[in-house]
Amino acid sequence: MARFSVCGGDDGEGPSNNNHQSRKRQRLPSIDENEEDAETSDAGSSGEEDEDETQNQGMRPESEDRGSTSDDSDREVVIEERRFGKFVNSQSSSSSKDSPLSVTLLDPDVLDCPICCEPLKIPIFQCDNGHLACTLCCTKVRNRCPSCTLPIGYVRCRAMEKVIEASRVSCLNAKYGCKESTSYGNRFSHEQVCVFTPCSCPILDCHYTGYYKDLNNHVRAEHKDDLISFVWNTRLTISLDLNKKTTILQEENDGHVIVVQVFRALHAVYVSVSCIAPLTPGVGRLSCRLAKITVDSLLKQGFMVKNIQKVTNEHPEDGFMLIPSYLFSGNDNLNLQIWIGHGRIFVHS
C-alpha cells in the first residue's frame, strides 16, 4: 500500500506535534467522533502517563513494534485517501497511460463540417461564437458564419484539429478482411481504393457478398455447374441464351469471374463483358475480344472489361459490342467467340 504523510513533515516528539496532528485529524469527516475524543484525552493526559506509555512501548517485542508501525501506516494511507475522496492504486503501470484510448461517439456527425456535412479536415476555422467550418465552406460563405453572421475563416480551432488528427477509424470493409485504419477525414479516400470492397455473387438467387477473391472461391465451390471455364488469351466459343441474359465464366487457374450479358434492342443485341472485382488500382484490368462469324461476314471488336461489384440489368453505356439482328437470324441463341486477357492486349487486335 502506498504511504502518504498526514502531518506534512518528520514525526516529532512532545505535545506540540501531538496537538498539531490531533487538530488536523479533527477536520476529517470520515473519522468517528469517538476516535477524536480518544485522541484528545490522550493529548491531555499527564506527562507521567506518557512516560509510562513510552517505557511500556520500549519493552514490547520487535515484531509487535513492526505490526504497530504497519497499522499506523495503513491508517495514514486510509486517512489520506479519504481526504482526497479517492483510492490510489500504487501498482498502476506507466505504460497504461501511453496506450490508445477507445472512444465511442454517439453522434459521429460532430466530426463533420456543419455547413457541407463532409468530414472535417485540417485546417478548421471557427468564428467568435465557436461555430466551425472547413476551408472550402469559409470560401463559399465569403468568410461570414451562416449561423451568427460573424466573420469566420481567420481563427483556427486548434482543439478540434487535434481531435481530428488523433482520431483513427477502421475501414468499413473490416468485416471483409481490411485491416487499414485511417484518420476520420480521409476515410472516404481510402474506401474508394480499398481492394476489400464487397462484391456480390452473380448467380441468380445467391446472396453471398464478400471480398472478390473469396467470392471467386465461393463461386467455384458452390456454383460449379453454372460456370463455363476459360483460359487466359485462349479462344472460347460460347452460345448465349438471349432469354437467360447472363452467362458466367471463370478462369481455370486464377478464378476470375467474368459476366457476359445480352440485351435485346429493336434491331440488334448488346453484348457486354464485365469482371466481378472492385474498381481500385490494386486490381488489374482485363480486356476482351468478341467475334461473330457467319458464312458471309465477320464482326469483331475489342474493348476493356469493366469491373463491377454487382450484376444489374441496366443497358451498358460502354464495354459492349452491338450485333445486328440479321447476323443471328432471329434465333434465341447467339454463338460468339471470345478471348480474355490481362491489360489492353485485345483492345486494338
Swiss-Prot record:
Keyword entries, A-Z: Metal-binding, Transferase, Ubl conjugation pathway, Zinc, Zinc-finger
Span list, region Disordered: 1-77
Enzyme Commission no: 2.3.2.27
UniProt remark on domains: The RING-type zinc finger domain is essential for ubiquitin ligase activity.
Zinc-finger ranges (RING-type): 113-149
Record's catalysed reaction(s): S-ubiquitinyl-[E2 ubiquitin-conjugating enzyme]-L-cysteine + [acceptor protein]-L-lysine = [E2 ubiquitin-conjugating enzyme]-L-cysteine + N(6)-ubiquitinyl-[acceptor protein]-L-lysine
Protein name from the UniProt record: E3 ubiquitin-protein ligase SINA-like 10
Keyword Transcription regulation: no
PROSITE patterns: ZF_SIAH (PS51081)
